[in-house]
């Protein structure tokens, strides 16, 4: 028997970081939120989706990595990192961001078709938000009902750009875009009229089903599932089995 055969094989431990004091293993190249989600750990988020590259616009997934703030959807996991997410400070920061989103748009949950299936609403509940903290903007935004199968309600848009990315990267149609600056930033429809009905978007497009809020809705299905029996009515966002806990 050779010396090599007689040697005890040492199995290397997978690379890992700590998330709120608990070890999370990761695959090389994964971001913190990817590794955490794969391990069944919830980090609040709105614009992140596992099907797409990180966007980093909502900042709801902000965590502290070795004491420094960073977006969990863009920061790569590394061995030995000490990541904090579920802290009083970070949750207060997230709650403030959510309160700002609610007043910047027109989000009226009791009458919204998306209630109980809305990631914004579910995340607000998760963060303990009970009402607006800031003065409502009440912006004047249109509702586009020009498409035979899809309703487009700009009042609820949170500028996550998931529909923009889905239409461009999956559907290969580029139906949506973002225009404007500051508080005037808005979702645009890429047609001469600016109407969704003048695009080639269909109900089967990924962009038609990925909206985490109530901006893009299929017509004639609004209350097919009664309020009280919807996804987030039955189970909070932090306990959801979906890989992103949000948009399907």
Predicted feature residues:
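Terminal leader/tail segments of proteins
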Residues: 2-12, 16
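Fe-S ferredoxin-like electron-transfer domains
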Residues: 3-4, 59-63, 68-248
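A short beta-strand micro-motif
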Residues: 16-19, 63
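Aromatic-flanked redox-active Cys/Sec active sites in thiol-based oxidoreductases
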Residues: 21, 49, 152-155
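Short, well-ordered turn and helix-capping elements at secondary-structure junctions
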Residues: 21-23, 191
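N-terminal cofactor/phosphate-binding cores enriched in small/glycine residues
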Residues: 23-78
């Amino acid at each position: 028997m050779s010396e090599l055969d007689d040697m005890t094989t040492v199995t290397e431990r997978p690379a890992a970081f700590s998330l709120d004091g608990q070890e999370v293993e990761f695959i090389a190249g994964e971001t913190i939120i990817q590794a955490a989600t794969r391990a069944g750990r919830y980090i609040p988020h709105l614009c992140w989706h596992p099907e797409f590259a990180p966007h980093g616009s909502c900042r709801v997934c902000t965590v502290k990595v070795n004491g420094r703030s960073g977006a969990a959807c863009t920061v790569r996991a590394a061995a030995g990192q000490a990541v904090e997410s579920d802290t009083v400070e970070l949750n207060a920061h997230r709650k403030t961001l959510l309160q700002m989103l609610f007043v910047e748009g027109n989000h009226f949950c009791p009458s919204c078709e998306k209630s109980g299936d809305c990631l914004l609403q579910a995340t607000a509940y998760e963060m303990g938000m009970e009402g607006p903290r800031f003065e409502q903007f009440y912006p004047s935004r249109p509702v586009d009902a020009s498409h035979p199968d899809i309703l487009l309600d700009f009042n609820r848009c949170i500028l996550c750009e998931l529909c923009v990315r889905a239409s461009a990267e999956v559907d290969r149609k580029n139906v949506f875009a973002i225009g404007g600056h500051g508080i005037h930033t808005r979702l645009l429809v890429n047609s001469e009229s600016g109407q969704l009905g003048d695009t080639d978007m269909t109900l089967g497009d990924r962009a038609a089903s990925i909206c985490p809020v109530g901006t893009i809705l299929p017509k004639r299905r609004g209350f097919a599932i009664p309020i009280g029996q919807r996804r987030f009515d039955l189970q909070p966002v932090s306990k959801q089995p979906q890989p992103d806990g949000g948009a399907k």
